[in-house]
């Protein structure tokens, strides 16, 4: 039997499980103002890695958070439902959602096209990317953030 070819991904920053284990998160506010003090954008209680600057926070929240259509979760991570049983939708509220959206999409397309040697390699790829995005070791070009 032929050995499956594909990308092997060794972990450097993460261990199997939660790729965010070694990252400290905090709630912040993001506010963008005009020179005259008028508010262009404001969003409160967003979750960001604690090592990020306020400028990085403002860029992430104002430019790259999805502003609508995202299932909302309660404090335990359960999807909120309205009185009809439909998902309650709203904005992204955590940079984890953005990192997950990107890394999971890249993994999906990599697996779909046979890019990885195994599903474990695909998981390692996803986890390592999530960590690198959260620690600002890597970042895609701007259009990737919006998709």
Name each model-derived stretch:
Residues 1-147:
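Extended catalytic cores of very large enzyme megasubunits
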